[in-house]
Amino acid sequence: MADGGSERADGRIVKMEVDYSATVDQRLPECEKLAKEGRLQEVIETLLSLEKQTRTASDMVSTSRILVAIVKMCYEAKEWDLLNENIMLLSKRRSQLKQAVAKMVQQCCTYVEEITDLPIKLRLIDTLRMVTEGKIYVEIERARLTKTLATIKEQNGDVKEAASILQELQVETYGSMEKKERVEFILEQMRLCLAVKDYIRTQIISKKINTKFFQEENTEKLKLKYYNLMIQLDQHEGSYLSICKHYRAIYDTPCIQAESEKWQQALKSVVLYVILAPFDNEQSDLVHRISGDKKLEEIPKYKDLLKLFTTMELMRWSTLVEDYGMELRKGSLESPATDVFGYTEEGEKRWKDLKNRVVEHNIRIMAKYYTRITMKRMAQLLDLSVDESEAFLSNLVVNKTIFAKVDRLAGIINFQRPKDPNNLLNDWSQKLNSLMSLVNKTTHLIAKEEMIHNLQ
């Protein structure tokens, strides 16, 4: 505290009135000796009496030493009931010094790590969490104790309870906690929420992390953990473009770039997920940026696959399966497959989505090169039935990816976008002016010819 003052539990800042350090130096060794002889209760009563004097005199250092000594003696004597009882008693004493309580709690936190008997450990954690509740000056210790408790609950199979306990912590508001530790806590909260399939809460918690933090040194492990959790979250949401961005962030991480196998797997996932993402301006821009990556040369099959989706030509699904199916789903010795199109329920769904992306690509190409086309011809080009083709076309029109009007009676699709009335009027006016100028010029030339003939 400023000017050597100590803060009491009620918030008052007080100065030390009497220095008891010499008395404490003398009494503590005597008490330790008596405690080892089994006279613990007598020692505690003596120390509590001394603690009252040091506390009243606002001697923070001496009070801290006494509080730490009491809990230490109880711990060494394995008097667990006495330990819990004294923690509660000492923290609630009238006008107790905050720094002294903080020192005692910090000492007890080391005992939590050392105790192996689970019921005793849980009781001590419970006592310490009760003592630290609502106290800002021991918020970090409370957070660490809560994390330990959540870990124990998870190990015992009660993941739901572990997630619930850890969610109590609003660590993003803990100014005294290091940024790195705060991020570790938030990532643990995300992991447990995903484990209990609480995706909405995971999404909310993920927003508490500013990704600029991962640009700092020694944050690569946390960065990879964060993006892997985000991939799991977006897999559930089916947001392929977001997954692609997460894999790009993983791919750009120096420790991934350092290992050929790892960056290749990450880049393969980037390519596959950007292809799986429905077409829009952002997806199109990302496809072209990924296409410019020189490292794609080292995974030629994936480079060629990406090129198919940037080339303004129709693709046949059967040809694509023949050329790339084995590589994408099973891989080869030189190029292992990713888990994107694995033989799982999710893998099969993504494989089906890839076929949908091929169909959508082909319809966009038709909209570019055709003004009108029959339904039968379009279905033939897409290798689909008429009904399936119409369903895909309708979906693209609804998403405003293309413009089309279907005459179902005639079986004709019109891709020509109707012109804006103002533009139409301007075009008509311009053409009319051009026509009148031509008529005027023609009339003038006829008159000129007549005059020449009359002179002759």
UniProtKB/Swiss-Prot annotation:
Keywords carried by this UniProt record: Acetylation, Isopeptide bond, Proteasome, Ubl conjugation
SMART domains, per the entry: PINT
Positions where N-acetylalanine occurs in the chain: 2
Keyword Acetylation: yes
Cross-link Glycyl lysine isopeptide (Lys-Gly) (interchain with G-Cter in SUMO2): residue positions: 92
Family, similarity comment: Belongs to the proteasome subunit p55 family.
Cross-link Glycyl lysine isopeptide (Lys-Gly) (interchain with G-Cter in SUMO1) mapped to chain: 92
Protein name listed in UniProt: 26S proteasome non-ATPase regulatory subunit 12
Self-association state and partner proteins as the record states: Component of the 19S proteasome regulatory particle complex. The 26S proteasome consists of a 20S core particle (CP) and two 19S regulatory subunits (RP). The regulatory particle is made of a lid composed of 9 subunits including PSMD12, a base containing 6 ATPases and few additional components. Interacts with ERCC6.
Summary of the function given for this chain in its UniProt record: Component of the 26S proteasome, a multiprotein complex involved in the ATP-dependent degradation of ubiquitinated proteins. This complex plays a key role in the maintenance of protein homeostasis by removing misfolded or damaged proteins, which could impair cellular functions, and by removing proteins whose functions are no longer required. Therefore, the proteasome participates in numerous cellular processes, including cell cycle progression, apoptosis, or DNA damage repair.
